[in-house]
Amino acid sequence: MAKRHKHYNARGGGKSKSKKSKPHGESRQRKNHRGGTSINRNRSELLLGGGDLMNPHQVEDYYFGSTAKKSSLRSGGFRPGRLTEADELDTGRLPSRKRPVEFIKAKELYDPSHDLILKLVKKNQHFDEPNSDGYNSSQSVSLREEEQDGEDEQQDVDTQEIPSKNTTVKIRSDNVVSENGDSESNSSANDAELFYVDMEGEEKTADNYIKTVDVDVQERSLKLNDCTEFQPTLRVGNVELNLKDGGSGSIEVDKPKSSYHPFHSYIQNVMENVQNYDSDDDFDENGNDVEQSFSISSDYEFESSEELITTGGTIEQFDSSMKSLTIEEIPGKTITASLTTKDISQGNSDNSSGDESFGFCEDDFEGSIGKVFVSNIRIGAGTHSYHVSCHEIYGDSEPRWVDDEMMNEIIAEMGLPEHRFRAYYKHLHKSFIEEEEEPEEYADIPFDDDDSDDSTADQCEPFAEDDLGEDLDDLVSYALKYNKQRKIEYHTTSLDIRGKGRNKHLIFDQTAGMDEDIKLMLQNKFATRQINKTKKRRAKEDFLSQSHASSTDLLMKYPYGLHIQNIKDEFDAFYRNDRQSITFPPLDPHGNKIIGKFAYNYFMKASNIGKGKSTKVYVEKTKKTRFNKPAYHIISQLLRKRPVFMRIDQKAPTDTQSTFNRTVRLKVSKENFNISEGQIVGEDAPEIGIDNIGRRMLEKLGWNIGQGLGAHGNQGINEPILAKVKKNKSGLRHTSENQQ
């Protein structure tokens, strides 16, 4: 019989075996055992209060549902006391995006800022009082207006009683303010029927009395421009003015009291240039020195900045005063300068004290300038830079580059007077910049006259001409004599070479007719040339190996092969450094497999790249490499296996192969292993030598050659027992003599 599938059970034929299948027809309404249909309590339109509260099944069906599963999340989905229509249940099953949106108009106007403003108005009532100046602040006026608007909008609260049998309920009702400002009633019923107004009120008792406490509040005068802060300085472009608050909104400007002149710095620079003036062009046409003196005269007296402002002085006055400054040539060697200002006279006095070299003045030791360390100076076209380190200023000993202005602030902070700045900078420049030495001029050395030179030249000329002529004749005669031999061409041939490595030698032709001495000499020269080539090649390889010893490229570092310990060292270095990948030289398949095992135990990833003899192992780090330690117990086992791995893409020389300690087979002749019948064992063994320790002990005990090893009277045999080789199976008594 064919097997029926489960979907046949839901077709109504036969008894349903599936729990999920539903019968056809009126299956949604459960039939009562009395013949009627039971009401679906989940879709009941009656409140639970109208039902039977004593029936636990009805309460359970209402809250949790009888058709729902025990573990269903839909149980308890209805609120008590709510009507559940069929439409609401249908919409409840829909997703949120498909449910209809309902808009409900609020019964009250929600305005939290309005109540907050009213509280602030009551709290700041003392601002409404007039100030000492006789006017009210704008803030108090605005707050009062807002308070009046709030009082107009606020409505009275009525306490109403709804008559019932035994209870009275007080309801606080507020009118709803529409968008146009008109009040609308919540119902169309009459006020007399809905509300009850208590006209008597409540009696005032002692408990309802609220005690009030008078608190003295300090009056605060609010200014019109209270938001503006007073700043003591005013900057306009590059000009900075000091201000004072005069009160009552007035501001005063502080004028500088110190004397100031716009050309003060210019005149001071001119005077310094005049004092330091030194020129090499002060010579006339005949080479005599021209003595000059300069005099700078000025009849203008400097005024303060206040006098300039009051008198309304202009720049033209200063231009006329500058015209009076003249430089005149006066015979004399002294340089004179006359100035009427006090500032320049003081500056000259400072310069006189500042001309002393740094370290020879008492002012140099007033501060702690020795804590400023200057390690280098960069000289520029306009400004210089200094490499300075000062723990007192920066809090550390690290040097940094600073400019001239910052350097002046540092040395001033360390206590060096201003008039010693120049000497300090000279001291720094002399310590770092070496003065160029002028080349020596030999102007004082007298030269010979022309007459003496002519006389010496006349004496040398005849001798030189005679020698030159003789040499030319000899040279011409020698060239003509051997001219024919120079054009002769000689036929050269190279000798043949036979052998490899150290066995290379020359092959001489018997028809060449060479002597034995010449042949031996050529053989020695050829051997020397081969040795020199080998030395040069080894020197080149040693140089390359030393240069690539610290290289990260293993193909250059190991040109012929590497040891098992080298592989471990490379993995250790790669594990500690910041590189992410490494490539090993191409080895044989077993060597590449060993490198893969090393990578696995170091928690790295190994992959083969290339084909054939150029197959290399590419190793890269992974996330596990950082958080795991290598398995050194397994790595130590790998070190005990195959020690040497040669590269398969390079052919190593014979001398290099010996450096890897390769095992070499010994070529032993096979004759020693052929043992014949009747051969005496140890027949060819040598006699025990004198160096043997056992023989020397016996000789000290009195033993001599030819004696036995026994005691006196029983020395034993003098010769050892001979042992013969027996290879056939004929027996011990069978010998070759018996066969005969």
Curated annotation (Swiss-Prot):
Q: Which GO terms describe its molecular function?
A: nucleic acid binding
Read off the PROSITE patterns from this record.
Answer: G_PATCH
Q: Say if the entry is tagged with keyword Nucleus.
A: yes
Query: Compositional bias (Acidic residues) at which positions?
Result: 146-159, 435-456
Q: Which domain of life is it from?
A: Eukaryota
Biological processes, Gene Ontology terms: mRNA processing; RNA splicing
**What GO cellular-component annotations does this UniProt entry give?**
cytoplasm; nucleus
Residues passing through the membrane, by range: none
Protein localization: Cytoplasm; Nucleus
Which keywords does this chain's UniProt record carry?
Cytoplasm, mRNA processing, mRNA splicing, Nucleus
User: What ranges does the record give for the region Disordered, renumbered to this chain?
Assistant: 1-52, 67-93, 126-191, 435-464
Please report the stretch or stretches of sequence annotated as the R3H domain. Answer: 561-623
Give residue spans, biased composition: Basic residues. 1-22
Q: Which residues form the G-patch domain?
A: 690-737
- Polar residues: bias regions: 133-142, 162-190
UniProt xrefs under Pfam families: G-patch (PF01585)
- Extract the PANTHER family matched here: G PATCH DOMAIN CONTAINING PROTEIN 2 (PTHR14195)
| Family designation | Belongs to the SQS1 family.
Functional note: May be involved in splicing.
Protein name, UniProt field = Protein SQS1
Organism from which the protein derives: Kluyveromyces lactis (strain ATCC 8585 / CBS 2359 / DSM 70799 / NBRC 1267 / NRRL Y-1140 / WM37) (Yeast)
Q: Taxonomically, what lineage is the organism?
A: Eukaryota, Fungi, Dikarya, Ascomycota, Saccharomycotina
